């Protein structure tokens, strides 16, 4: 990947713009078969694109809605980054946007009582007892952003990192909440619509202090403004 970055160095955004060079590996079946079967041949691509800051203005909370749809099936492909998982979220996401919500909150497909993921990102909540809580499920896509935040919550903010069940009827245990992923790093959640009820966390207009601190810490590391834990940063010579 270092060679690839050097070959595309002209697309690296200038420091200070908040923009980044986004790299996405893709594996596509291209073999000559039309049946439902693994492809006999694959094409590996690294998609490279400069992207601007996810937020057009300041970091700000938005509202989400609990979906009646299932994102992934039990014992299915929920933990893999495959196109089918995203296809299942297109209609629910469209309907959420039509109702002026940023995205959907998906529950576990077996009991529909536990939060699993937020659209294309992971969910987290922060309790009044200073716990940083994320759902734990075999249907959740592993996220380097989530694991980075779990580490920083502990080592930088002194929060207690917890991976476990997050019941949708117990949202009042959280004083702050958000979604986390590669693109936005953190998307603060102002409130969640669940059926007829609407739960507000810290605020619908202001970012919670611990969410802000986590965002500043991780983005500061990414842009070389704060000290990174050992092994997190790799220098890529561009000359």
Regions found by a protein language model. Name each.
Residues 8-9, 153:
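Active-site helix/loop of acyl-thioester processing domains in fatty-acid/polyketide metabolism
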Residues 13-28:
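Extended, Lys/Arg-enriched charged tracts that mediate electrostatic binding to polyanionic substrates
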């Amino acid at each position: 990947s270092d060679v690839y970055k050097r070959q595309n160095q002209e697309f690296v955004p200038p420091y200070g713009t908040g923009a980044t060079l986004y790299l996405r590996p893709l594996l596509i079946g291209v073999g000559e078969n039309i049946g439902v079967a693994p492809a006999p041949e694959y094409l590996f691509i690294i998609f490279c694109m400069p992207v601007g800051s996810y937020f057009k203005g300041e970091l700000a909370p938005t509202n989400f809605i609990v979906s009646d749809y299932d994102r992934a099936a039990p014992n299915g492909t929920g933990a893999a980054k495959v196109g089918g998982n995203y296809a299942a979220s297109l209609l629910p996401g469209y309907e959420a946007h039509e109702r002026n919500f940023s995205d959907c909150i998906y529950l576990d497909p077996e009991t529909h009582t536990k939060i699993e993921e937020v659209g294309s990102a992971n969910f987290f909540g922060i309790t009044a007892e200073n716990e940083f809580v994320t759902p734990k499920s075999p249907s959740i896509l592993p996220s380097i952003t989530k694991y980075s935040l779990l580490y920083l919550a502990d080592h930088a903010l002194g929060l207690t990192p917890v991976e476990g069940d997050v019941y949708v009827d117990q949202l009042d245990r959280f004083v702050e909440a958000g979604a986390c992923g590669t693109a936005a790093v953190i998307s603060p959640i102002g409130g969640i619509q669940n059926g007829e009820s609407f739960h507000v966390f810290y605020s619908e207009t202001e970012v919670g202090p611990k969410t802000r601190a986590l965002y500043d810490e991780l983005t500061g590391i990414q842009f070389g403004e704060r000290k990174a834990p050992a092994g997190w940063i790799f220098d890529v010579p561009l000359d």
